[in-house]
Amino acid sequence: MNLKLNVLTIILLPVHLLITIYSALIFIPWYFLTNAKKKNAMAKRIKAKPTSDKPGSPYRSVTHFDSLAVIDIPGADTLDKLFDHAVAKFGKKDSLGTREILSEENEMQPNGKVFKKLILGNYKWINYLEVNCRVNNFGSGLTALGLKPKNTIAIFCETRAEWMIAAQTCFKYNFPLVTLYATLGREAVVHGLNESEASYLITSVELLESKLKAALVDINCVKHIIYVDNKTINRAEYPEGLEIHSMQSVEELGAKPENLSVPPSRPTPSDMAIVMYTSGSTGRPKGVMMHHSNLIAGMTGQCERIPGLGPKDTYIGYLPLAHVLELTAEISCFTYGCRIGYSSPLTLSDQSSKIKKGSKGDCTVLKPTLMAAVPEIMDRIYKNVMSKVQEMNYVQKTLFKIGYDYKLEQIKKGYDAPLCNLILFKKVKALLGGNVRMMLSGGAPLSPQTHRFMNVCFCCPIGQGYGLTESCGAGTVTEVTDYTTGRVGAPLICCEIKLKDWQEGGYTVHDKPNPRGEIVIGGQNISMGYFKNEEKTAEDYCVDENGQRWFCTGDIGEFHPDGCLQIIDRKKDLVKLQAGEYVSLGKVEAALKNCPLIDNICAFAKSDQSYVISFVVPNQKKLTLLAQQKGVEGSWVDICNNPAMEAEILKEIREAANAMKLERFEIPIKVRLSPEPWTPETGLVTDAFKLKRKELKNHYLKDIERMYGGK
């Protein structure tokens, strides 16, 4: 075996020699042609600085230091004006695209479950003028049905073109839009609809039949339901007095001359645009009130960090539009003339679960240049690709590693490796269509390991951002020239960020070498508070002596010397153990989530106990293979319940924890393996795949008692 490895190593020597010669010959012309010197200088420059020498002073972007940006396009101070600007500028250009469903087939899985598989056609596009026509017709139709300006209308629907058309209608006609995640459970949906007192609801037939129908008995105010599909439903199955319309019929009503002639009542910057209900990761969803001016300011900051945004770009929309990251990204793309092609997590790639084998996924057909992704999705891509690499033979694996390491070194220096991109990473890039020039990451911290992998294999920068629903998604975004990892960039030009001492956690603005503390964001992008929840609004929001709004995030950050922010902890994730040690559950999870055997992990601790435990969703393929090697037999559920497999996972956890330099008391010493993945549909994670700790605790209550010895 050693002889074989030595022979292969000798055979691979010419590869190393070729790389050395290639680097020497190509580097100098490439360096000047790509303006690498300027990019390096941009990457290393100071990006933000404090407004004064006083500790705790707010940091601002150096490019907009004297005042915060509040508007991007002159005169467009409301969302409807952004829409009108885009329609006037890009009229006949493709705007919103949807793939045709050619056929559906049921496919039996080995476990007996039946999966619906789709065969999809090409994207069908409507242009900006056609979107405008539909918006006008839908708005006039809603007005004809009796909806008044400043009266709320709710949307509970999957991400699709009709969602965006409905939203643009509401912005133009001054109907405050109440947004609800399509994956919310019955209790959360009922709460949001009743609290917002929305009398009109936009949804899909699937959600109407599967979730809303049974909940209508508890929903007080909804009088009109508009479904977006071109389908028919049996109205006799619904309560009397509830009017149900198709979106098409409402548009046809609005297109009548007597209705279309009624002009919309336009909003002002201080009018409510959205009441966005959160995903409820920490309990009951809260409605965040966003004025037009808040969203305009937030998107002004976000767009400044995406160079070259314009008509040559194609954006793939698949994340929930009820999430502030996706909504602001799509409105920004629409404003700048980008095409938006709609997708879903189940049809995104050729290997996605709803795509029939041999058919093409949405990325392959659309070939997007821009896309947003939550870290959970990037982590899955990373693990899947690296799993394929491990299955290669020795020569292939070694060639991949040589190319990967070489490009990684080039990236760390601020350079690139065009030959590696062409030869080694072309197939990996093709997983997302092959044309992605920038990816936006948000919703949760992205691990440095996954960040580097995406840089290397997908040959594009990752704009890692930090923002919250309460800040209209705006806070920080890394610049495309900044190839560091583990940070979320400098404050956007629309806001300023300061740190506040958190003595209990041991973080202060006087810490060395860098100031640390709770992140507080200020600017016009800060929303107006929580809907009908003055107590929580007063707790989390404040207004300073200059009238500027601030939001206390609950996240702990550290400012680096160049003005970039790093998220290092979260107040709500901190647990004090019985012996007095503080454990950051988020820190533990971040350190362990990239273990090959682990698909997802939730750390758990109680203040009356002395150790940390964990719940783990194992990687089915890898754990099944390990079980075979260890002689463990049975179903997937049997494998997950086997103590020997728990021991193997704990062994991997210990190794990874030691490699990441976790303290002894931070390392989970007991584990419960979950045979079922945590998806938004299970209610255990949000649509951005953030852990719902309360729900996870309730779900694993018996296991918690068992792992803590029945106490």
Curated annotation (Swiss-Prot):
Membrane topology, as annotated: Single-pass type III membrane protein
An example GO biological process term is: fatty acid derivative biosynthetic process
Regarding activators and inhibitors, the annotation says: Both triacsin C and rosiglitazone inhibit arachidonoyl-CoA ligase activity.
CDD domains tied to this protein: LC_FACS_euk1 (cd17639)
Which PROSITE patterns does the entry mention? AMP_BINDING
Cofactor(s), by name: Mg(2+)
Top-level EC class as recorded in UniProt: ligase
An example Gene Ontology cellular component term from the record? endoplasmic reticulum membrane
Q: Which residues carry this modification: Phosphoserine?
A: S447
Transmembrane parts of this sequence: 8-28
Query: What are the record keywords, sorted?
Result: ATP-binding, Cell membrane, Endoplasmic reticulum, Fatty acid metabolism, Ligase, Lipid metabolism, Magnesium, Membrane, Microsome, Mitochondrion, Mitochondrion outer membrane, Nucleotide-binding, Peroxisome, Phosphoprotein, Signal-anchor, Transmembrane, Transmembrane helix
The compartments listed are: Mitochondrion outer membrane; Peroxisome membrane; Microsome membrane; Endoplasmic reticulum membrane
> Which residues lie toward the Cytoplasmic compartment?
29-711
**Reactions mediated catalytically:** a long-chain fatty acid + ATP + CoA = a long-chain fatty acyl-CoA + AMP + diphosphate; (5Z,8Z,11Z,14Z)-eicosatetraenoate + ATP + CoA = (5Z,8Z,11Z,14Z)-eicosatetraenoyl-CoA + AMP + diphosphate; 15-hydroxy-(5Z,8Z,11Z,13E)-eicosatetraenoate + ATP + CoA = 15-hydroxy-(5Z,8Z,11Z,13E)-eicosatetraenoyl-CoA + AMP + diphosphate; 12-hydroxy-(5Z,8Z,10E,14Z)-eicosatetraenoate + ATP + CoA = 12-hydroxy-(5Z,8Z,10E,14Z)-eicosatetraenoyl-CoA + AMP + diphosphate
GO terms of molecular function = arachidonate-CoA ligase activity; ATP binding; long-chain fatty acid-CoA ligase activity; very long-chain fatty acid-CoA ligase activity
InterPro entries per record: AMP-bd_C_sf, AMP-binding_CS, AMP-dep_synth/lig_dom, ANL_N_sf
Q: What is its EC number?
A: 6.2.1.3, 6.2.1.15
Role of this protein = Catalyzes the conversion of long-chain fatty acids to their active form acyl-CoA for both synthesis of cellular lipids, and degradation via beta-oxidation. Preferentially activates arachidonate and eicosapentaenoate as substrates. Preferentially activates 8,9-EET > 14,15-EET > 5,6-EET > 11,12-EET. Modulates glucose-stimulated insulin secretion by regulating the levels of unesterified EETs. Modulates prostaglandin E2 secretion.
Q: Which family does the record claim for this protein?
A: Belongs to the ATP-dependent AMP-binding enzyme family.
Q: What is this protein called?
A: Long-chain-fatty-acid--CoA ligase 4
